Amino acid sequence: MRIIFMGSPEFSVVALSSILNNTEHKIVSVYTRVPKPAGRGKVLTKTPIHTVAEMHGLTVYTPKSLKRIEEQDRIKELNPDVIVVVAYGLIIPKEVLSIPKYGCINIHPSLLPRWRGAAPIHYAILHGDSQTGVTIMQMNEGWDEGDILLQKKLSIDEQDNIETLSNKLSNLGGAMLVEVLNNIDNLVPVAQNEDNATYTNKIEDFHIDINETAEVACRRIRALYPRAFVFFNGKRLRILQASYYYDDSISSLKPSSILNSGMHIKCKGNTILVPLVVQMEGKTLCSIKDFVCGYNVKDYSIT
């Protein structure tokens, strides 16, 4: 088949590589987001997919929108049998959805219809889900509402963070994509159950609420890795790894109390958050053991 691949972040690289390395299908072009300034020097940086595509000698297009007639005409000229979309970042208009023989298919890292939207992996961790998975669906005009072509489950380990779980789901999605492309004529699409649909939003707040339980705080640290933070005496302190425990003897203490020199933090419901790896703003990351050597932490406040 002739395939147009649309993707942008690291998550989509495995899917592209899986087509290149494990199928006989031809990728006629790759679509990705335009290069953006990144880093302290604001150097114009290509997306991971852009870089990988160029390494393989593939033609890359970076339109700002697919709604323009000229862009749609170019896709028609490429004559794709199918368009594969993996975390592309642009809306696919109905005019494009209808161009390929087999339409557009999307890899979504959740067990649809649970966790539709922009942050399904984050939400699975935040809500304490014991399992998640990958859904490959036939795209329509809705928000992750298309019929399911293939779906597989994956257990979430207690120590998984957004990085480790994304890698696992990316690998699973790549293997599933090969299966779908090689059997596309024999697949029977299954409609999603709208009664079970849940939705996610892009996450913009990375603050850890100490007034929640320590278990919830740990989920947030894992889901927002490595950006979750508390304020330590007014300065941002990132917590990259943590554990928690219960202690009924501390019920009289208010949340945010620092219990000892190891910086165990009282949270809601007699739960204690134990930071393990931290990073003060402007500093390098370090173990909590090294961090507390520089402070008498019980004299400081956590918010």
Swiss-Prot record:
Would you tell me the protein name for this molecule?
A: Methionyl-tRNA formyltransferase
Q: Which reaction(s) does its UniProt entry say it catalyses?
A: L-methionyl-tRNA(fMet) + (6R)-10-formyltetrahydrofolate = N-formyl-L-methionyl-tRNA(fMet) + (6S)-5,6,7,8-tetrahydrofolate + H(+)
Keywords, A to Z, come to: Protein biosynthesis, Transferase
The cross-references to Gene3D superfamilies, in alphabetical order and at most eight, read: 3.40.50.12230
Q: EC?
A: 2.1.2.9
Listed GO MF terms: methionyl-tRNA formyltransferase activity
- One cellular component (GO) term of this entry: cytosol
Q: What's the stated role of this polypeptide?
A: Attaches a formyl group to the free amino group of methionyl-tRNA(fMet). The formyl group appears to play a dual role in the initiator identity of N-formylmethionyl-tRNA by promoting its recognition by IF2 and preventing the misappropriation of this tRNA by the elongation apparatus.
- Matching PANTHER family: METHIONYL-TRNA FORMYLTRANSFERASE (PTHR11138), METHIONYL-TRNA FORMYLTRANSFERASE, MITOCHONDRIAL (PTHR11138:SF5)
What InterPro entries does the database record attribute to this sequence?
Answer: Fmt, Formyl_trans_C, Formyl_transf_N, Formyl_transf_N_sf, Formyl_transferase-like_C_sf, Met-tRNA-FMT_C, Met-tRNA-FMT_N
Give the residues the record marks as binding (6S)-5,6,7,8-tetrahydrofolate. S110, L111, L112, P113
Q: Which domain of life is it from?
A: Bacteria
Q: Which family does it belong to?
A: Belongs to the Fmt family.
